[in-house]
Amino acid sequence: MNGLRQNMNRYEQNEFNPLMPHHIVIVEDEPVTQARLQSYFTQEGYTVSVTASGAGLREIMQNQSVDLILLDINLPDENGLMLTRALRERSTVGIILVTGRSDRIDRIVGLEMGADDYVTKPLE
C-alpha cells in the first residue's frame, strides 16, 4: 500500500480541497483486493464506493461527486485502459491504475491513455 499512500499524499497536497469529503471509487473485480483497498481507505477517513465494472463506475459518477478512481485494467465488462481514455475525455478526476500488469509498455500505455499514475499489484 506504500505506492498508493504516496499517490494519495500527492493528491491531498495538490488537488483535494481539505474542507470537502474525499470520495474514492475502487473499480476492481477481485473481492479480496476490493475489501483490502476499501478497508485501508475507509480507515484513512475517505468515503469509498466499490464496483466491479465500468458500468458501475459510470452509475456512481452520474449520481455522486468523485475525487479519485482506483481502476483495475482487467475488468469483466470492458478494458480498463479504454475506460481510462473515455473518462479522461470527459473529466479531470484523478485516475490511478491498480493492476497486476507490471510490464513497462502497459505502464506507458496507461499513462498515455490519461491515467495520473500506475501502481502494480500485489499491494503491500
What does each of the following model-derived ranges do?
Residues N7-N9:
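Intrinsic-disorder-associated, low-complexity terminal segments enriched in Asp/Asn/His/Tyr and depleted
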